[in-house]
Amino acid sequence: MFSRRSHGDVKKSTQKVLDPKKDVLTRLKHLRALLDNVDASDLKQFFETNYSQIYFIFYENFITLENSLKLKGNNKSQREELDSILFLFEKILQFLPERIFFRWHYQSIGSTLKKLLHTGNSIKIRCEGIRLFLLWLQALQTNCAEEQVLIFACLVPGFPAVLSSRGPCTLETLINPSPSVVDAKIYPEEITPLLPAVSGEKIAEDQTCFFLQILLKYMVIQAASLEWKNKENQDTGFKFLFTLFRKYYLPHLFPSFTKLTNIYKPVLEIPHLRPKPLYVTVTRDNETIYSTKIPYMAARVVFIKWIVTFFLEKKYLTATQNTKNGVDVLPKIIQTVGGGAIQEKVPELDGAGATEQDKSHSNSSTLSDRRLSNSSLCSIEEEHRTVYEMVQRILLSTRGYVNFVNEVFRQAFLLPSCEISITRKVVQVYRKWILQNKPVFMEEPDKKDVAEEDADKLGLSETDSKEVSSESSGHKRSSSWGRTYSFTSAMSRGCVTEEDNTNVKAGAQAMLQVFLTNAANVFLLEPCVEVPMLLREQVDACKAVLIIFRRMIMELTMNQKTWEQMLQILLRITEAVMQKPKDKLVQDSFARSLAGLLFRTLIVAWIRANLCVYISRELWDDFLRVLSSLTEWEELITEWSNIMDSLTAVLARTVYGVEMTNLPLDKLSEQKEKKQRGKGCVLEPQKGTAVGRSFSLSWRSHPDVTEPMRFRSATTSGAPGVEKARNTVRQKATEVEEFQQAESTAAADCDYLVVGQQPVPRSSSTSDITERLYSDSSQGQKVENSQNLSSSEPKSVQESKGHVTHEHEGVTILVRRSSSPAELDLKEESQQTHGRCRERQKSESTGSDMAVGYSNEAELPVSPWQTCEEDPELSTPTDAVADSDARHWLQLSPTDASNLTESRECLADDCSIIAGGNLTGWHPDSAAVLWRRVLGILGDVNNIQSPKIHAKVFSYLYELWYKLAKIRDNLAISLDNQSSPSPPLLIPPLRMFASWLFKATTLPNEYKEGKLQAYKLICAMMTRRQDVLPNSDFLVHFYLVMHLGLTSEDQDVLNTIIKNCSPRFFSLGLPGFSMLVGDFITAAARVLSTDMLAAPRSEALTLLGSLVCFPNTYQEIPLLQSVPEVSDVVTGAEDVKHYLINILLKNATEEPNECARCIAICSLGVWICEELAQCASHPQVKDAINVIGVTLKFPNKIVAQVACDVLQLLVSYWEKLQMFETALPRKMAEILVATIAFLLPSAEYSSVETDKKFIVSLLLCLLDWCMALPVSALLHPVSTAVIEELHPSRAPLLDYIYRVLHCCVCGSSTYTQQSHYTLTLADLSSTDYDPFLPLANVRNSEPVQYHSSADLGNLLTVEEEKKRRSVELIPLTARMVMAHLVNHLGHYPLSGGPAVLHSLVSENHDNAHVEGTELSSEVFRSPNLQLFVFNDSTLISYLQTPAEGPAGGTSGGSLSDVRVIVRDISGKYSWDGKVLYGPLEGRLAPSGRNPSFQISGWHHHTCGPQSNLFHGEEGDDVLDKLLENIGHTSPECLLPSQLNLNEPSPTPSAMNCDQEKEIIEVILRQSTQEDEYVQRCHSNSAVKVTSQGQPSPVEPRGPFYFCRLLLDDLGMNSWDRRKNFHLLKKNSKLLRELKNLDSRQCRETHKIAVFYIAEGQEDKCSILANERGSQAYEDFVAGLGWEVDLSTHCGFMGGLQRNGSTGQTAPYYATSTVEVIFHVSTRMPSDSDDSLTKKLRHLGNDEVHIVWSEHSRDYRRGIIPTAFGDVSIIIYPMKNHMFFITITKKPEVPFFGPLFDGAIVSGKLLPSLICATCINASRAVKCLIPLYQSFYEERALYLEAIIQNHREVMTFEDFAAQVFSPSPSYSLSGTD
């Protein structure tokens, strides 16, 4: 009927509207056309001009339609007509508010609205009636009557009847009042439903909530629809309605609404715990819904949500969003009733809308979409934005409204768990106000306004209280609609009194205090643990509140009152939530969900508060009381430990100037420095970025901290500005970090906490810290300060003393006052230090870092916590939290930063707020005090009831102590490694936990785990170098604790102490430490006697091994514990030694752990050396040697190798062994021989490489013993019962040595007959030696990682690898040993000293045919030289050299000498020979030299008979003298009778006298017969021959004659030698090969670096610059070897130069098999940078370093930067002239001995043991090199290559020709 088509002729339509002749329906049609086509301003003028006719048109049409509906019922056309009529009615109300205000058509409009509001109408008509009624009521305002107010009070069904003058009223009674006079003739017209509801119409289940939503929504959106001429009336219209709402509805919605909520004068009473309500369950749509029986709870939620809508970001919808698929969607009012309103849950006000519904069975009018779109309950149209903003402005316009809103929000915090979702909405509002956009009432008031403010004005809260307390309204209602009730009366009754309170600025602090107090109610509601869903809801709400708390802590500036309120609230919350009930079931789940977050928030808030304001002692006491009562919560311990980590990082930075994330020791290697220099300034911004992103990693590590997505506001979740803000945070964090680093440098000058070695007087301004920290102790013991408080200190400081009194009841750090005074007293800077600090701070205050950092810091738009909440996906490992965490939640707030800058600049002598001063933020005193207080905030940790929690605390204490120790290690570290800084003035309190630890050891056994942690920390604490020596009281307590622990029956306690108390404890030399030696021995023995696999067996044996030298040093060591199986207490040094060695002997044979067995064997070796060096002649030395000897045949080759190394060590003590027992050195060799013979059969066929290598080690050890023992010992017959029985001749030891060597070369089955008997283990059996001593097995370690074939292929070719593997290791080694013995036994060392082993003579020396001084090809053309190959293994050069003539005369003939140069696997040797038998006439004159000895350097053994060998008298028996001389020069050639060869042999023992006579007779008879025969021949002329004359001798002239003669004498020219004797091809390649072979070493070589570190040296420059050391150091270096002159040294140089650039001398040690050169730093010049560089190059390139350190701190490997140094042996001199040894090695280096890590040795043993250990360490390192070869293996390969490539194969004739004439270019005579 009424279409929306355009009417072009507006004027025509106007005329028709105003034409009274037209029917009212036609006029309505044209009026509707005008409404659609005319602007609102023109319409208002039109309506005001023609108001009467317009109302007539409306009313007539309305009455007509009403009658039609009553008669005909409703249909679609009538509903459309009703829509049009009501639309006109709405426009009348909108355009004519001024007339309506004066009650224009008052009764008619009222009657019409009653018809629409009739409860019998359909829901849609009733909603439309409410909307139009609110328009009318807003227009009437003060001219409304009581009936209109009562109708408003009854619009929402479900509330109690409103009391009036006629009694209780409802909407029904108000629409159709009952007649007051029963017999009256005239009655008011009965109002009936206009459009009754039909059956099937969907009705909201909770009509109260539904109509309340309608009412609240229309109160807002209709507030601005009236076209007032005075626009201000729009505000008054809403205020009028809202006042009525608060009067009639609010008391029912909020029965506990109070006037006390006043942010202008807040009442901050902390709430109490509320019991949980009774929850009822309703199941709807398969979903369980929980509610309470609290009246009007759902309506209360609706109202709170409505209020929240004005303060949260709203979702405005445009007109296009209200259509779907191009078709108009159903009106929102229909959608709401049909869909959303039937739900129990109230829909979100900022949601996206509800679903469509079916249009059937609906009596609702099809109102136009333009009007219906205003009725949405789920979203806010764009056109309503202004009206919502207007209402928001109104709600914040006066103090009364502000207090009202905050009280409503307080009521939201009181909601039960089932409705707590709206509480989270309120939390979002507060979050927006506090953290983002502050409302006007949070702005700071003007000072003038504050001064003039009337304290009595309490705003709306007071008037509301009057309403609540007044009589029940007392309305006197009349039947007429007179002006008996007006807006003026409402004002006089206190409904609206806000106008006088328009100054709403209260300041942020008051608002924060009110929020803190109200928000606590969320936590203080008893949780419903029976319903998990409700529990989760409450937990989520609590976390949302805590998020704001945390952001406030981090980002806001709060005054003291606000801080105190926050701390009290957090304490109350924590105490209420975390206090476990007696049944331990009710609150556990709720408390557990909040525990970590709540504890962390509380502690962080406490720390931040103390940095910003003064916190009273009473609050600290409450803090201590609450947390110490909650120690059963594991979460508390976790958060406390995390906070302590962060505080420790701050303490390190502010007090000690150390950054825990950038420690000096972590960046000292030169490689890292180069990388940093290469990256330049990129590092700092990157670090800042990382810090900015991970603000508080320990909070971020908890997933329950992150705010859920549904809590986020629309402005921050995904907003474009957020990422930009985060980048700003990162940038500013970098700048702040840079400033803080500079600040910490300045603060380092003013550090305090624990004194170092030099006392510095305290200043009066900070000495109060000492008083407060140590004012009381737990036992009531008063701690006295070394300095009294100054009388001039500020009063505030004096009043604030003793904040932590009760804290120390738990932390009993002091045993008594005298306990370690230097450590427990606080140290403060002097006034002079203050002055320096002030100057430095002033200079820094003008720097760019501080100016930029702090000026920009205040601009941070997004806090770190917000970053966490917004970005939960950004996760960072929790192990990196320490300092980055502290850098954020412990940094100053932005506004505090500038204040700090000023205070630091102007008040440098002041102290922190916590110390009574004015400085905020982190300073040395605040950091130390807070660290100390938070440490003790748990109370006495030994009072914790839970053993698990107790153990966790002590476990963390160990971690905390480790951090403090790390800080100490990083103090006074040279950053550039160029100079050593002075010792630190302040050191961390490493013994601070002592009293806790001591007490923990006395706890019952149920606290065992904590006790073990305490023992572990005690050991770590007392095995560390003590900067300040503990006093006697402390030591007595410590020794008592250790004694009780070491004698404990608990095996775990023993294991813990032994594992963690290293031998360093003995090296510290604490007073009285020796009293624990016996306890340690006993405890270690008990640990070793157990079968526990986890027992610290290696540590126990290390302890025992470190004590082997103590009994000789400390002559009487008491044993405080009786020895098992001995009733008396053992005392005295000898008994202790016996006790100790018996344990070592037992474990050296029975220990199952491989490493421990090795340590036990090494310990025995050290003890043997100690006893031999001290000449103690202890009887158990033999037992120790027996164990070591038996271990040689142990299946585990690692253990056996250690035993072999020990035997090799004893080589240098053979003389001491001989003094101990004459046969003992020979016994060593016999053991080796028998062991080799025992192991050889299995080893030579074994596929395991270690078996073969061990045989090689035994062979080399045997060689060392053979070379060390005198020849007489080796020639001594082996005397054993078995051998004497089988072999009466008793072969010498050397014979058995050669036999076993021959077995190694030829195979173990070589000697199987009795005549070739080899020494066996059974032959060694005697009373002193048991070769079959039983040995227990050990658990093998991880197998050695062999190099793969691919790795080998990368190093050598396949052919070379095959060649290397073709060399048989055992036979080759045995051949080398035999060659070595043949050449050197009895000769080494030569006259040139031990440095010369092989010959230095070559073929060109003394060669008349060669002019060059070096070996060259000219040598091969010499006629007097020939080169041969013998047995395909040896190169032999024969050279004929001219002999010198007799002195002072000429010789009859010039005889030549023969020189034989031999090159084999053992080395190069030279022998000179002379003609022994020749013509008498050509006998040479006495020679004044012995060229063979002088040239080759052999030692010349002079013997008496030898000198007269060729110069006896005529007729002397020269042969007789020769035979006699052989007995002197070569005793091994003598017969077993030891008679000279020229002496008659004694009579054989088996021959008697008769037999002897018979033999003599036979011989004489034969002699007589021979003489007779000769006589007969002489007499017979037939047998006579012609006599020949003696030929005259001819002098040989051939250059190779005598060489050829020698070859003939040696049988080399015989046929049987022909296959083993060959010539070499003489060419340039051979020459190069020979030179290369001669350059190879003939001994094992090692180069060892030696460093000297003096006291206070911690940089390489200082260490390398040392030119001399202490006397003990010089004595040690002298004991390492012989000091050799490098310019003339002939042995191994190790890279040192002869020109003096690397020093003039160096220690050198050598045997016939090993050479060691020591690169001693103090021997090398350091006068220039080049010298230092060269020195470092030589020292750093060595694999093994010896470090002699006299510094008070442990040596760090990084001080000497080198990629080598695989093994470092550090020597620390002790006070008792003993030396503590630590060995650090790379993990891949295998075990080596004889010294081990932790050994303690005496000065006599030190050089030899260090030297032996260095050699073994060098061998261990070299064995890791792929395809590493020993010197003889290398020589064997070279020899093999020479022989294969240069051996010349020829016929015998050619061979003889070459031997006859080596060089055919020379013509030789036939007689040569």
Swiss-Prot record:
Record PTM Phosphoserine, positions in chain: 373, 376, 379, 486, 696, 819-820, 1592
Region spans: Disordered: 446-481, 711-730, 758-849
Highest taxon of source: Eukaryota
This protein's UniProt keywords: Cytoplasm, GTPase activation, Phosphoprotein
Gene Ontology molecular function terms on file: GTPase activator activity; protein heterodimerization activity
Tissue and organ expression note: Highly expressed in lung, liver, testis and thymus with lower levels in brain and heart (at protein level).
Gene3D superfamilies: Rap/Ran-GAP (3.40.50.11210)
Biased composition, class Polar residues, residue ranges: 775-795
Feature: compositional bias, Basic and acidic residues: 446-469, 796-810, 824-843
Subunit structure, as described in the record: Component of the heterodimeric RalGAP2 complex with RALGAPB. Heterodimerization is required for activity.
Protein name: Ral GTPase-activating protein subunit alpha-2
Source organism: Rattus norvegicus
